[in-house]
Amino acid sequence: MIQQKVLFISLVAVALGLGLGLGLKESVEPQVSCRYRCNETFSKMASGCSCDDKCTERQACCQDYEDTCVLPTQSWSCSKLRCSEKRMANVLCSCSEDCLEKKDCCTDYKSICKGETSWLKDQCASSSAAQCPSGFEQSPLILFSMDGFRAGYLETWDSLMPNINKLKTCGTHAKYMRAVYPTKTFVNHYTIVTGLYPESHGIIDNNIYDVTLNLNFSLSAPTMTNPAWWGGQPIWHTVTYQGLKAATYFWPGSEVKINGSYPTIYKVYNKSIPFEARVTEVLKWLDLPKAERPDFVTLYIEEPDTTGHKFGPVSGEIIMALQMADRTLGMLMEGLKQRNLHNCVNLILLADHGMEQISCNRLEYMTDYFDKVDFFMYEGPAPRIRSKNVPKDFYTFDSEGIVRNLTCQKPKQYFKAYLAKDLPKRLHYVNNIRIDKVNLMVDQQWMAVRNKNYNRCNGGTHGYDNEFKSMQAIFLAHGPGFKGKNEVTSFENIEVYNLMCDLLKLKPAPNNGTHGSLNHLLKNPFYNPSPAKEQTSPLSCPFGPVPSPDVSGCKCSSITDLGKVNERLNLNNQAKTESEAHNLPYGRPQVLQNHSKYCLLHQAKYISAYSQDVLMPLWSSYTINKSPPTSVPPSASDCLRLDVRIPAAQSQTCSNYQPDLTITPGFLYPPNFGSSNFEQYDALITSNLVPMFKGFTRLWNYFHGTLLPKYARERNGLNVISGPIFDYNYDGHFDSYDTIKEYVNDTKIPIPTHFFVVLTSCENQINTPLNCPGSLKVLSFILPHRPDNSESCADTSPDNLWVEERIQTHTARVRDVELLTGLNFYSGLKQPLPETLQLKTFLPIFVNPVN
């Protein structure tokens, strides 16, 4: 036994000796790193630093504890330190080896940990086809809104936003996208997803009163989710109604049970959710099995709008907000690339409106105009006024009196007051009971408020006229459906709904957009528009003798040979063809009104379509060169005669215009454009007459006598088409003859509510309108026909100080003119129809920048 113990001790001694001799020792080195140790259980027996969640309290954490164990719970990015990290339950995203399998990698995992090229550093995609992984038969569409992203930000600070700049470079972008009026958040977001103007979808502002509901709408009121406020069909319903799936990560209207349903997936708005969490959730939706995966997704972030409101659009803070928005886009694109979806998904990045600088030194107070402000006012950059006692006094409120008291009261006012019916037609802001009758159009950087208690006047705001440059929004698009490296002209956001439907191969619901007008953004347009079909062909108005007896009351003592003068109206076929080539170079305006009775009247210098329903031309068309004649015409009272081609019963008479009336005869084709007396006599006929308010003729005559020759010189000639508009019910569409009779029952000759003018020239001004092989350029106006010029405070002002500004205020799209007249322009153009639609939806901008 003793021998055994001695042997055991000897063996231990030998073993220890060998161990010491060979340098072997027990693994008891103190721990110095948290790598693979985060959230381990604390042990008093362990040597070295700790990595449990209480180590900071004991001041025993390893030096890399914050970077290794804390930062992953706060960061949405990988780092070299995090690569191959041990899986932790509470991280925002993972950089572990199994994260791809678990589908919870940080979006930059492959570029940071696997050495792959990031999306930002990739070359622009060169393939013309979608490159989608298995299971994606159709490209998903993501609609991403960055609230308040003014188009000018991208012009000024593009180098500070590398991700957005790459999207712009590689995809399709517009210099800007035009918001609808008022340029507010809910208004424009809902327009984008319905294709409807606010007057059509009902969200006419962020704050609304509806007398029929007797309810108020605001962004914070519980009534906001009442479906009665929300009209139209938002894109997420169009998607689901046609068998696809839609998911919305915030969008105005998406959490409302519109038409009885919600999007397939939706989130209740919560502004505290980080942008990165929103992107991560969107990416998870794209990871879903095919049967659950959405085909359409919205994503919304509040920046740079929130910062713009607080600090204004020109500030260091706005740059930081833009960089945050840029990083959010970068995170989305990296996440798409990690899923091999970056060249599969179609992405539209846009904004709802821009942002403008404001100051408490630039306020207009209603107390300066009224002894007592006894009404309710929606204050700010897009003010409206109504009765404060509603619903009782809603309909009896003296809106006209309010407008009078706010018109031409100071030498310099920073707003103009309008009845809604007199607002520029381009705004499409009248045809809804929720739009109050009194509206103030406020100058840039100014606001109109009740009194001096108003204090929300520093920083930035929006809501102004949508023609102001500061209100312009961004539009960028990227993906296999869009052309690459493509810049397009500006367009209005009502067109985006149709565009999205085309990308998803859906049939759009009725909307205010012009379907096909954005085909030039797409590689392979899904929808090919068809030409409008004329509903009514012209009748014949043959040349005939002067009626006897002549009861027209017209006279012209300067005509010595009436037969010879009238014979000039009897053009043969060759002369008619020559007249059409000169006066209708882009085809005859087609009449889309049903049961309209009219005939074409050819003269050498102009052609008109005379309506036997309203006893005046529907339109008159002529072409003037860069140096039109400016001889003084005979006055209408001295020289007018019946058009012998029009039966007396279907003609205006001079006796319709009595000196004591406010209405006077005006001409569509100016007689003074004739280069000889005979050519002027061709225009001094009753078929060229339109009834005009005497006050309006000041504008009309200055426009034709001064501005039209000026524009002709600048554009190397013009084709001019003008005519009356009848919109008595203010719905933005032409009134039928029966509707006109409802409003005008005391005369056979109705008074137009507006007049339109469409000026067309060659884009390349080397060429004339008659010889234009390339693109056309258009300038069109819809001029309210009002009895006075109080809109311009022009009673004592020379015409040159106000007329041009007035007509520029009332610029319009050709498409607006078409809707209000029932006419179809440019029917003779040989170019593809989508190019013509671009021309028709173009809106010129005249607003001068703020000094």
Swiss-Prot record:
A divalent metal cation 2 binds at residues 147, 185, 352-353. A divalent metal cation 1 binds at residues 305, 309, 462. Its main location: secreted. Pfam families: Endonuclease_NS, Phosphodiest, Somatomedin_B. Its cofactor is a divalent metal cation. The active site is at residue 185. Glycans are attached at residues 39, 216, 259, 270, 405, 512, 594, 745. This is Venom phosphodiesterase. It comes from Macrovipera lebetinus.
